[in-house]
Amino acid sequence: MSMTPREIVSELDAHIIGQKDAKRAVAIALRNRWRRMQLPEDLRQEVTPKNILMIGPTGVGKTEIARRLAKLANAPFIKVEATKFTEVGYVGKEVDSIIRDLADVSMKLVRQQAVEKNKMRAQDAAEDRILDVLLPPAKDQWGNVQESDNNSTRQTFRKKLREGQLDDKEIEIDVAAQVSVEIMTPPGMEEMTSQLQSLFEGMSPSKTKKRKMKIKDALKVMLDEEAAKLVNPEELKQQAIEAVEQHGIVFIDEIDKICKKGEHSGGDVSREGVQRDLLPIIEGSTVNTKHGMVKTDHILFICSGAFQVARPSDLLPELQGRLPIRVELKSLTKEDFERILTEPNASLTLQYRELMKTEGVEIEFTKDGISRIAESAFRVNEKTENIGARRLHTVLERLMDGISFDASERRGEKIIIDENYVSEALNDVVENEDLSRFIL
């Protein structure tokens, strides 16, 4: 990650409106990963990441920041929900599985990079296999291949293959047979299932089977097979583990849902126990994965929660100490809603315009129409449950319902969505609190 904090914030601004503090905190944390890697080895081990706790109501951009960050980071990244985990010893996923899943993500990322690096060599080998099927090499009476006879023809076919002229021709090829092993285990033991499957698949002898397919599909299959031959699995494992340990990022959503609210007695397997299990992973421990042992000392953890019922102080004191950077995300205003409808690269109004354009219907949202949509969403949020920007999806779906249904019969029309159009479509629902509670 060589992007500066300003560049990271600018990239996030293209998709997320407002929340400057959260964007800055995330950008600094991401840049610090790069800064740390420039330090001498002995000092690098001492610099630990400053984990982040994002606090804010639902629908203000916490999860969206995580999604966009994953694309920017180009590093092993996983987003999980705290409510999915249970305390060790109970049925359900253990928190260690976060690191195992992160290692799997890293392995996939490293494999993709290795395949990309060897793409040219793999492409040539895959093309040779296709050409061997199309033009079996001529052999002399002793079984030796005579290359000179059909070399020019082979080059002609290779040119046609690269230009896509042979894409739809069907051929029969030998492909590696995938051995599928189905293992039934009780709920919460998915990790054991995947390990047993890997074990049995590794023990079974590699076989090939003949398959008939189009050349363009065969080329993809062979490209994957040839690329797999060019990479060293052991090297990949080492690179994947190093990538997790040095650059891994874990985003834990809904952390407020595992807080112990007030004086509560009795078994509570999904709350305080999960917090206790999270402590060693965030602080730094070693987790056994199928790719090897992973140290979590330098993995960056970003936690988020609405904290509408519980408060950050309801978290275990030890866990609070391991999340030193606190960022509060603000509730969205009517002006924020207007910007969300128009400013992001794939804004909601743009999505609807392009969707209707496929039916030959032109949609135009006027400025006063957008203002009225934003006002309607904001008012419904105030009067009922505040679900932030997600309310815009509900309001727009209600507004576009008739157009979406009749679009195929209105080809060639231009529909202008102005203040009057929005008022007619939404007024009854917005004004009636009981209706808006159930419909919007």
Curated annotation (Swiss-Prot):
Places the protein is found: Cytoplasm
Keywords: ATP-binding, Chaperone, Cytoplasm, Nucleotide-binding
TM ranges: none
Chain residues that bind ATP: I17, G59, V60, G61, K62, T63, E64, D253, E318, R390
Species the sequence originates in: Mannheimia haemolytica
Chief location: cytoplasm
Residue span of region Disordered: 141-161
Record's keyword annotation contains Signal: no
Name the UniProt record assigns to this protein: ATP-dependent protease ATPase subunit HslU
HAMAP family in UniProt: HslU
Role played: ATPase subunit of a proteasome-like degradation complex; this subunit has chaperone activity. The binding of ATP and its subsequent hydrolysis by HslU are essential for unfolding of protein substrates subsequently hydrolyzed by HslV. HslU recognizes the N-terminal part of its protein substrates and unfolds these before they are guided to HslV for hydrolysis.
Family statement: Belongs to the ClpX chaperone family. HslU subfamily.
Gene3D superfamilies, alphabetized: 1.10.8.60, DNA helicase RuvA subunit, C-terminal domain, P-loop containing nucleotide triphosphate hydrolases
GO biological process: protein unfolding; proteolysis involved in protein catabolic process
Composition-biased stretches (Polar residues): 143-155
